[in-house]
């Protein structure tokens, strides 16, 4: 016989966790959506609700239930409830993988503004796809309306210290089309203080740096989805954003006159994406095109006690990507092939040279299954790379294999995989000319730099135990000819790109996702602990200000939420990262934590959120540069990130039902896309 925990006891436990007294009565929410099967992916997982069928361990589907997710939550917030995802400063990554996963909405790249405005209630399911032809991806599938429907939401945010934001998501849906418009605006003021301690000729010098920056950002996104038949779907996305900043920094030094640097500038980005997929039987053909252009303009004005200087920097970058993919089945084999062409061109006032990059990639893959439980995934990525500057041309061929073997049981799954990847230097890195990143600091490129190669061997295991989803991974990573910037010992303000050395890393990752109290409380924890060794190349050991060495590292995220029957939701979110060891420095971070309370009104149309951001006061980083194990430079940065945020979300919509004669209206008017 199951034991029932009284709600008063549940609330007492939550009050001890949050330091807040709660009250409410039990109630189970409902949903009006159905999930239709998709032959592309096998295995369905449900967050904290029903039995999880792990299926293919590196291709999983999670259906997001409304229980535990705050009313008015957006898609980026919903991703924090997905098992096995880690959130970092660069974006989301899948547990046991070092690369940043690409986030998609219905197969098309998603911008941060679109993720922040897409309602979580519009999500049908979340697909976590690791490895394979397209790398790590997180694909958010939206619900599609079977009737005509107009809906939207407006988000307003106010934070202290000064930060104001506004965004909207307006969607018009029909059975064959979806039109979405997402405008957003942001204004903020940020203060960062830094303390630099540097040794020169055995004498220590101090330098205090204070930066104040005002940011104005505006963007708009238009997305059009068209489904002429159940076999053919198309997506067109256009986005424009402008990010302007205006700020100044003041520096006080022990041995040099104080100085003030005024900086103004803006960045404009224009992107377009087109995707089309046609499916017949067990096969489908997918075509994708991506066009992007970026303008960057910076104006610097330096004032010291002895002189004044002004500089203006401009850069223009264009990207063009085309991809086609064909997939089909033959017995136990699922064969796929894809071709991609990527062209990138950059012009910059930093350098008189124009940079061009052209990459042709042909990928051949095979997914094979042996019975119901055993399977494998094999991929060969053949690439031709051409990089051009006005003074040099680099050409190279690459053959990059990927392979995995997996076993999937009723409640558990295990996988062993191997991957070889190559990181290419950009135009800024191979450009041998020198350009200044500030009035005093400058960087030199390296025309003879080699590509960085990374070998990864991983063992992963997942298991479902009642309402708890466990995932673990052990990874071994070996990087050769690592690309990085090194500081010259004779001139610490000069940074030079080089193949600085090689590294070896071992990491053990653990993920826990569990629900309690009839799914009103949800815990999602992901963490990684490892040990890394950095070996400086012999030619840099005596001439560079480098750290190298070895040591442990750790990182992780925690999302703990509790929802009462009266639609109060309490959330604790934490993100931490331990010592970061690179070839040139060691860096320590303070953790970032915030507490949030959410309440919905007016039949869930209005949602209010109150957040306490980072009560420790600052996001602090402590960076140290060494030479022969003796610290030469220490840079401590304090980003004043504590504060309070008040958010308001208003949702609205209207459904237009259409029928002929005495045709009955089905109770379910929505289905998965």
Walk through the language-model features, giving the residues of each.
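Periplasmic plug
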Residues: 86-131
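Outer-membrane beta-barrel translocator/receptor signature
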Residues: 134-138, 146-194, 215-218
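Flexible loop and strand-edge segments within Gram-negative outer membrane beta-barrel domains
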Residues: 188-317, 355-359, 434-437, 619-622, ...
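Surface-exposed extracellular loop regions of Gram-negative outer-membrane beta-barrel proteins
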Residues: 136-137, 141-154, 243, 248, 386, 407-455, 476-494, 616-629, ...
């Amino acid at each position: 016989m199951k034991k029932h925990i009284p709600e008063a006891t549940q609330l007492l436990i939550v009050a001890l966790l949050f330091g807040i007294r709660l009250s409410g009565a039990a109630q189970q929410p409902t949903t009006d959506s159905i999930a239709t099967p998709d032959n592309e992916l096998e295995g369905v997982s449900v967050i904290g609700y029903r039995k999880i069928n792990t299926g293919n361990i590196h291709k999983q589907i999670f259906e997001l239930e409304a229980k535990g997710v705050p009313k008015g939550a957006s898609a980026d917030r919903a991703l924090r409830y997905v098992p096995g995802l880690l959130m970092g400063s660069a974006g989301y990554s899948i547990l046991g993988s070092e690369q940043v996963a690409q986030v998609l909405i219905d197969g098309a790249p998603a911008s941060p503004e679109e993720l922040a405005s897409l309602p979580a209630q519009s999500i049908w399911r979340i697909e976590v796809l690791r490895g394979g032809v397209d790398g790590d991806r997180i694909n958010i599938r939206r619900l599609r309306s079977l009737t005509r429907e107009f809906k939207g939401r407006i988000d307003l945010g106010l934070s202290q210290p000064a930060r104001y934001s506004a965004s909207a998501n307006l969607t018009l849906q029909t059975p064959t089309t979806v039109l979405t418009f997402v405008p957003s605006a942001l204004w903020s003021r940020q203060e960062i203080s830094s303390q630099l301690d540097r040794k020169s000729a055995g004498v220590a010098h101090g330098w205090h740096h204070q930066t104040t920056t005002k940011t104005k950002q505006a963007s708009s996104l238009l997305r059009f989805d068209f489904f002429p038949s159940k076999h053919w779907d198309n997506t067109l996305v256009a986005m424009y954003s402008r990010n302007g900043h205006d700020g100044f920094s003041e520096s006080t030094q022990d041995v040099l006159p104080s100085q003030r640097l005024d900086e103004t500038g803006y960045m404009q980005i224009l992107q377009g994406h087109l995707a089309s997929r046609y499916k017949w039987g067990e096969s489908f053909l997918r075509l994708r095109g991506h066009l992007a252009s970026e303008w960057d303009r910076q104006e610097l004005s330096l004032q010291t006690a002895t002189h004044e200087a002004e500089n203006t920097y401009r850069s223009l970058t264009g990207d063009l990507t085309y991809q086609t993919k064909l997939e089909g089945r033959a017995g136990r084999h699922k064969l796929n092939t894809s071709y991609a062409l990527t062209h990138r061109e950059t012009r910059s006032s930093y350098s008189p040279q124009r940079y061009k990059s052209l990459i042709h990639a042909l990928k051949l893959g095979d997914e094979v299954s042996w019975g119901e439980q055993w399977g494998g995934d094999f991929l060969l990525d053949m690439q031709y790379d051409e990089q051009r500057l006005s003074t040099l041309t680099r050409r190279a061929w690459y053959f990059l294999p990927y392979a995995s073997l997996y076993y999937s049981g009723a409640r558990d799954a295990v996988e062993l995989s191997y991957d070889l990847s190559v990181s290419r230097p950009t135009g800024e890195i191979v450009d041998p000319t020198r350009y200044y990143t500030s009035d005093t600091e400058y960087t030199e490129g390296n025309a003879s730099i080699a590509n960085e190669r990374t070998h990864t061997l991983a063992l992963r295991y997942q298991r479902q135990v009642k309402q708890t989803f466990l995932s673990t991974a052990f990874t071994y990573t070996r990087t050769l000819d690592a690309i990085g910037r090194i500081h010259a010992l004779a001139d610490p303000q000069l940074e030079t790109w080089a193949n600085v050395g090689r590294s070896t890393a071992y990491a053990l990752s653990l993920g826990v996702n569990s629900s309690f109290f009839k799914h009103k409380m949800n815990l999602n924890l992901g963490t990684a602990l490892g040990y890394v060794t950095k070996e400086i190349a012999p030619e840099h050991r005596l001439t560079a200000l480098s750290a190298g060495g070895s040591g442990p590292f750790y990182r992780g995220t925690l999302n703990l939420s509790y929802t009462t029957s009266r639609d109060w939701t309490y959330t604790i979110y934490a993100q931490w990262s331990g010592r970061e060891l690179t070839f040139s420095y060691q860096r320590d971070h303070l953790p970032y934590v915030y507490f949030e309370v959410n309440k919905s009104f007016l039949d869930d149309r209005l949602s209010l959120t109150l957040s306490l951001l980072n009560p420790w006061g600052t996001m602090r980083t402590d960076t140290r540069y060494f030479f022969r194990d003796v610290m030469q430079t220490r840079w401590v940065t304090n980003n004043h990130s504590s504060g309070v945020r008040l958010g308001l979300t208003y949702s609205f919509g209207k459904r237009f039902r259409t029928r002929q004669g005495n045709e009955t209206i089905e109770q379910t008017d929505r289905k998965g896309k």
